[in-house]
Amino acid sequence: MRRKQFQMSRVAFPLSVKTNGKEKRVAREAWKFDHLYAHQDIYTVTYDNPKNLQADKDTALTHVTVDMIQFKQGTVRQYVFNKQRGQWMLTAIDEHALSSATDKDFLAFYQKFATNTDYQHSHITNPFEFKTYDYDTFQELEGILDAAQWVDYCPDMPTGLMVNIRYGEAQPQSKFRALAIISISAGMGCTMEFRRQSKGWMLTRLEN
């Protein structure tokens, strides 16, 4: 949505905009161009079901949310998209506190995991599954690594601002999360898988 004319054609006016539960309707003439996450090089995708890891390729998909998560401010600006008559439309914007987010439990865990090394190391299963690619032979390499080796493969994780995409409806009660971290400029990414166990959320797999 980098072009104003295109963006205007893909907003369902009057647009529902909620701020901490209070709703207003924004008319077409009052709409201001929104860059969304166009200026962000890194974004993430969250999956809460192992069967949905290819959801971005699902042509039957009709619902997507994009969350602009400000961890320091403790806020979320959520853009809601729905497919209507074959076209993706922005149908709502919902600004709310991070503490009231649908996936607040996992997000609170992720914030600590991404910023606290000791906490991070205590939430990695030992051993953990690992998958990578040999770009010389184009072969997949899979195995297991000792938790002590995590430091050699730990990806850079968004901390202050996280732009997160979710395909389909959220399943906050699911005990599975996969978090894909994607760099637009590098054209590369990695995926971390977590499962909720007796100790809380634990990293169980890394695909790099």
Predicted regions and their residues:
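Generic surface-pattern signal
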Residues: 2, 11, 38, 115-118
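Short loop/beta submotifs within extracellular cysteine-rich repeat domains
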Residues: 4-7, 88-89, 121-122, 201-203
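Surface-exposed patches in mature extracellular/periplasmic domains of secreted proteins
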Residues: 7-12, 120-128
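Surface-exposed beta-loop interaction hotspot
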Residues: 84-122, 129-141
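Acidic/polar, low-complexity intrinsically disordered N-terminal segments immediately downstream
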Residues: 1-24
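Short beta-strand edge/turn micro-motifs at domain boundaries
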Residues: 72-100, 187-208
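Surface-exposed, charged secondary-structure patches
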Residues: 17-74, 134, 138-188
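Helix N-terminus capping/helix-initiation residues
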Residues: 2-3, 27, 116, 146
